[in-house]
Amino acid sequence: MQSYYGERIKMTELDRGSFGSKIGLILATAGGAVGLGNVWRFPYMAGQEGGAAFILVYIGCVLLLGIPCMISEFIIGRHGASNTARAYTKLSKGKAWKWVGYLEVLTGFLITGYYAVVSGWCLQYVYASIMGELHGDPTFVAEYFKEFSADPIRPVMWTVVIFLICHFVIIHGVRGGIEKASKIMMPVLFILLLIIVVAACLLPNAGKGVEFLLKPDFSKVDNGVFLGALGQSFYSLSIGMGCICTYASYFSRQTNLFKTALQISVIDFMVAILAGLMIFPAAFSVGVSPDSGPSLIFITLPNVFNEAFAAVPVLGRAISLLFYVLLSLAALT
């Protein structure tokens, strides 16, 4: 069985290709996990659900369920060496399991339906930051988002741009496209995160934001917190969406699956924590109550940047630009 498995992997590597380096494999697969949920959902949940207490529950969910499920998808993807639907079919002679693969494909398709649109919004806000269109009072910023999201042309245009960028990367294959792009975008994402975290933590009253995120409050831990942490761990690691299984189809037989899953989980967690240290110190420095979702990203934070850096408007525009470039990279990877 081992001989058959090894020969099969070797054969599919020659036919299908594989990642050219370990760092490229890690960054590309981690990029598939890291996304907008790390920025607009995890930090808010952590702050509202007990701070460090929620984070500990989340880590437990990742270790006990997230990583084992990721390894399972790695095994299925690497052995199947095909798209997600066919990978499940190859592993089982029965017909029932093939529908699991199709469900993962359907899940990814449904997520793409809104994810591509929101990713396009991020690109629009990169443009708006460059042109200074987000500089104004809170009412203006809220109306700007409302007007843009209701526009029948611009959101579609930016969504098309997102698909064209993805298409350009994908047509160059694994090594020349996805791996090469991830080697550039993921380090840049971390650099931008660190720059904005430092800028946010130097603001007055930034410590209150750090406390909101990290101070443990075990009195808030209940069944809802466990359920929320479990759901966030699966969503953040892209479990059950076909993404992880597809990336694993390009893994070589030398790839240590446990080590890879652990490294990806650590990177994903680091991005989520840094996102919280970026958002909440800035929000609390101007007395803004943080929220989650699109309103946090496209209404609350532009106002926070405007007010926090009101003394130096150019700096506020620069931080806003860096933030939306960061978001665009997180969405694209």
Walk through the language-model features, giving the residues of each:
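Membrane-embedded translocation segments of transport machinery
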Residues: T12-F19, E179, K183-L332
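Inter-helical loop and helix-membrane interface segments of multi-pass membrane transporters/permeases
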Residues: I9, E13-S18, Y44-E49, H79-L103, ...
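Central hydrophobic cores of alpha-helical transmembrane segments in multi-pass inner-membrane proteins
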Residues: G37, V62-F74, R78, T84-R86, ...
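Hydrophobic core segments of alpha-helical transmembrane domains in multi-pass membrane transport
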Residues: Y58-G66, V105-I130, W158-H172, P187-A200, ...
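Short helix-coil transition sites and intra-membrane helix breaks within transmembrane domains
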Residues: G31-G37, G77-H79, I111-V117, S233-G240, ...
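Membrane-interface "cap" regions at the ends of multi-pass membrane proteins
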Residues: Q2-W40, I67-F74, R78-L91, K95-Y102, ...
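Alpha-helical transmembrane segments and their helix-start/interface "positive-inside/aromatic belt" motifs
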Residues: G24, G51-Y58, K95-G113, E179-L189, ...
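Transmembrane helix-boundary motif of multi-pass solute transporters/channels
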Residues: S21-C61, K208, G242-A248, K259-L262, ...
